[in-house]
Amino acid sequence: MPGDEERGFLAAREELASALRWDSAQVFPLEQLMPLLATSLPPAARYLQLDAGRLVRCNAHGEPRNYLNTLSTALNILEKYGRNLLSPQRPRYWRSVKFNNPVFRSTVDAVQGGRDVLRLYGYTEERPDGLSFPEGQEEPDEYQVAVVTLEVLLLRTELSLLLQNTHPRQNALDQLLRESVEDGMLQLSEFHPLLREIVPGPRPSAQGSTPGPCFLCGSAPGTLHCPACNQVSCPACDILFHGHPSRAHHLRQALPGSHQTASLSSSLPASSQPRPPSSSLALGDSSLSSPDPANACLPWHCLTCATLNEPWAVFCAVCSQPKGCKVPGIEGSHGTGGLEPEPARDQWACQSCTFENEAAAVLCAICERPRLAQPPSLVVDSHDAGVCQQSLKQEDPLLTAAQPQVWYCDHCTFCNSGPVWVCAMCNRTRDPIPTQPALQSYPSSLEKGRPKPGSSQHLGSSLPASCGDPEKQRQDKMRKEGLQLVSMIQEGETAGASPEEVFSALQYSGTEVPLQWLRSELSYVLEMVAELAGQQDPELGAFSCQEARKAWLDRHGNLDEAVEECVRARRRKVHELQSLGFGPKEGSLQALFQHGGDVARALTELQRQRLEPFHQRLWDRDPEPTPCWDGLDRQSLVRRLLAVYTLPSWGRAELALALLQETPRNYELLDVVEAVRHSQDRAFLRRLLAQECAVCGWALPRNRMQALISCECTICPECFRQHFTIALKEKHITDMVCPACGRPDLTDDAQLLSYFSTLDIQLRESLDPDAYALFHKKLTEAVLMRDPKFLWCAQCSFGFIYEREQLEATCPQCHQTFCVRCKRQWEEQHRGRSCEDFQNWKRTNDPEYQAQGLAMYLQENGIDCPKCKFSYALARGGCMHFHCTQCRHQFCSGCYNAFYAKNKCPDPNCKVKKSLHGHHPRDCLFYLRDWTAARLQKLLQDNNVMFNTEPPAGTRAVPGGGCRVMEQKEVHSGFRDEACGKETPPGYAGLCQAHYKEYLVSLINAHSLDPATLYEVEELETATIRYLHLAPQPADGEDLPAYQARLLQKLREEVPLGQSIARRRK
């Protein structure tokens, strides 16, 4: 039965796993993880899925801090893989993990057992380029992923505490390293894949046995063993092979019996790599084909030129042909010059290392050079050839035991050090001619075994001729690679990437698509650089991605050098800030992290923090008291004004002080300063500082007053706010004019736009938000009413835009249908008929219409506003001056001509311009209402127009008698619609006298009859003076009828009754 401690551990573990499943981005504080880390349970009981002890032991090579850092970094990446699988929005390619991912290669794949952690996540299907989920599995097992992710998180936290020496159990590392095999085997069934990978491979030969040859060159003895690659190599080939970024973190160990005495890290110093001793050389042609490893370290004869070469040489020292290669046409001492058999069709031989690769391989499996790569150039520098010839002649015995430690590459002129044969810059093999001093030890054998190859002069002259084509190929290849690099840089600049970023991406990853790599992988690399830099020197704090990016670009993508550069740069910046008085305790590390390593911005932030108390005291203090302007030290007051308020000159400061010292002191300091900046005229300044409000008479400085663009009136802020607030809430939009002079005239469309555009800015700063919103609403309605497509509903007085051409319109508010022209309620009988025909049909066939009599006729011929087209079902009796409630337009209800206010009439000859008036045509009800009914009837009879003198048939009488025309009457409770009720004389068709005259005048206007035909001479003279502004006089000898006929003709010709009347344009 499990104990209490184990049960508590399992319960806490399940709780954290459930929280991780619920929120994959959950960050567990150290206090929450500490109970799981401080338990006394062994690792096998704490890590049920992950074999943590074996994972640590199999990667424990070298210093504990180094391999714990490497393992912690790999676990951090593995934890991110698990969190991505638990996230609701997983990455696009979550189903597979690619081995060529640079972050994966340099972190997870650099430790033993990393891939099997991925298999625990569910990546169980092997692919040639990586791992993936099985095809039939649609979703990952969330419980399994959560448990494994939690154990990875716990192990990473435990390693971090060990690195910081803060682990609650001091023997935690010993527990992980010394766990017995029996405890590890308890979990063999659960974690069998991990055991298979992390069990170390077989070591090379035991102590005392002869090491095998290098797996790369096959000549030099292997002295180093790489457990990750399970290969043995010589020091020179080890530097070349493990210089690749994917193998840079492999740990190598010296083989027993070799000259290496300690395990080697990923970077081996050149001075510590021994050369094979010259005493091991032995002559004999049989050694070339001996399969015995002991004989593999013997010198070999070139099959082309028969030159004896050292055992570790890959190319011939004279003809530069690979080992075992025959060239037709050149016969050696051991061959006939025949062609060497070609490789099989399913294989190809590498031109650099002669390894035979599979036909489908693009890169060599040994040296990773491309299939079409040319062999190293055979051009020999003249200086090196001369040194070689001189060495051959002198036969210095010291050269047999000494190897030059510094040599220059013939291709890139890079200075290499140590006994390496491959250039560290361009990966070209060094020229073997000057590195063959061992040949001087066997002159007799060389002379007896083969013919002499010729003198040194012959060698120097024959090489350029035989190597011309390879040199041209090398130059062509360099040109092609350069053009490819330029093309990639241009493509990167087009996409926004700098040339340094493209080049660094190529150097780091070797990818052919650097832009795609920069978008997908650069962020992970920068995070790794920042994390490694922080682990290298924790005292420097956290590193930002901007610092990591700069260091990575400066070091052209070299990860290790970028980490070193990042640390060096941070140390330099911290020292610079510390010299300025801001050390780590003052927050310099945090400031550098926040501002991406920018010293200037970090210094600004630190200075701001240091000045924050001063600013706080400055603003928290009470307002500074106003100085006494009557002080004895006048010069001090002037200097204070000049300095604090930045006045333009000393004279302006004295003028401001003089105004402040005047009595009575009605001026404010800021008002005086503002006024003095604009002028130095004292009289003008006094007027500027004491502007009188045109409404209330309050005196204020000019800069506090409000003014409209339509007039020169100055209004104080309080009057301005109250006037426009009342106008908005209780009046029309056209009443928002100057409260003092009443300008501008908002009936003019040209003034309307410019006035309201400026007034909008002033009202925004003066009115309350509710009043300002009401202003915008009313202004919008006023603009819509000016649209020619705007239409008022005849039933509910709702306005809307009607863009159709049909006469039948439906109101969107009350959904009633009416005629667009005559405003009558739409009936099916109106379809296909004009409005006049429909009205005649209703008079004849509609009983309700007939029952109303002539009152319905007057109601249908109500008042329509000529500006906004709003209809009023009112009779025209009473005052003819009508004020529209919708648009505030003033007009005559009889002729629809406008009424003009004082001094607003556009007629220059108008004699009543200084009063409210209107200009009416002679057939307007304004004049004809003074005629008697009999005279109006005579005008209709003279023109054969029928009219009613009795109520139409079927008309119902009003209870109590009286006129039936509906009127709006004012009562105590408001307005009420009711019948006129006045007395109806006989012969007036059931109407009162006023409404009967209105009925007759409407017939006269409908038939365009001219009442001037019934004018007397006095009426003709009055009409001539009114419309023609002339005082007519009878001609000499002209009788009265002729004079009357002449005035009538003149009036009808010069003042006709046509379409100029607004009523007829309705």
UniProtKB/Swiss-Prot annotation:
UniProt GO BP: CD40 signaling pathway; defense response to bacterium; negative regulation of necroptotic process; positive regulation of canonical NF-kappaB signal transduction; positive regulation of NF-kappaB transcription factor activity; positive regulation of xenophagy; protein linear polyubiquitination; protein polyubiquitination
Pfam hit, one: PUB_1
Sequence positions that bind Zn(2+) 4: 819, 822, 830, 835
Binding-site positions, Zn(2+) 6: 892, 895, 910, 919
Modification after translation (UniProt): Autoubiquitinated. Interaction with OTULIN is required to suppress formation of 'Met-1'-linked polyubiquitin chains and prevent subsequent inactivation of the LUBAC complex. Cleaved by caspase during apoptosis.
Residues in UBA domain copies: 558-609
Positions of region (LDD domain): 904-1066
Composition skew (Basic and acidic residues), residue ranges: 469-478
Positions with biased composition (Low complexity): 262-287
Taxonomic superkingdom: Eukaryota
Pathway field: Protein modification; protein ubiquitination
Zinc finger (RING-type): 693-743, 865-895
UniProt-annotated stretches for the region TRIAD supradomain: 689-923
Tissue-specificity statement: Widely expressed (at protein level). Not expressed in heart.
A GO cellular component entry from the record: CD40 receptor complex
Summary of subunit composition and partner proteins: Component of the LUBAC complex (linear ubiquitin chain assembly complex) which consists of SHARPIN, RBCK1 and RNF31. LUBAC has a MW of approximately 600 kDa suggesting a heteromultimeric assembly of its subunits. Associates with the TNF-R1 signaling complex (TNF-RSC) in a stimulation-dependent manner. Interacts (via the PUB domain) with OTULIN (via the PIM motif); the interaction is direct. Interacts (via the PUB domain) with VCP (via the PIM motif). Interacts (via the PUB domain) with SPATA2 (via the PIM motif); interaction is direct and bridges RNF31 and CYLD.
Domain remarks: The PUB domain mediates interaction with the PIM motifs of VCP and RNF31, with a strong preference for RNF31. The RanBP2-type zinc fingers mediate the specific interaction with ubiquitin.
Function of the protein: E3 ubiquitin-protein ligase component of the LUBAC complex which conjugates linear ('Met-1'-linked) polyubiquitin chains to substrates and plays a key role in NF-kappa-B activation and regulation of inflammation. LUBAC conjugates linear polyubiquitin to IKBKG and RIPK1 and is involved in activation of the canonical NF-kappa-B and the JNK signaling pathways. Linear ubiquitination mediated by the LUBAC complex interferes with TNF-induced cell death and thereby prevents inflammation.
Protein name: E3 ubiquitin-protein ligase RNF31
Organism of this sequence: Mus musculus (Mouse)
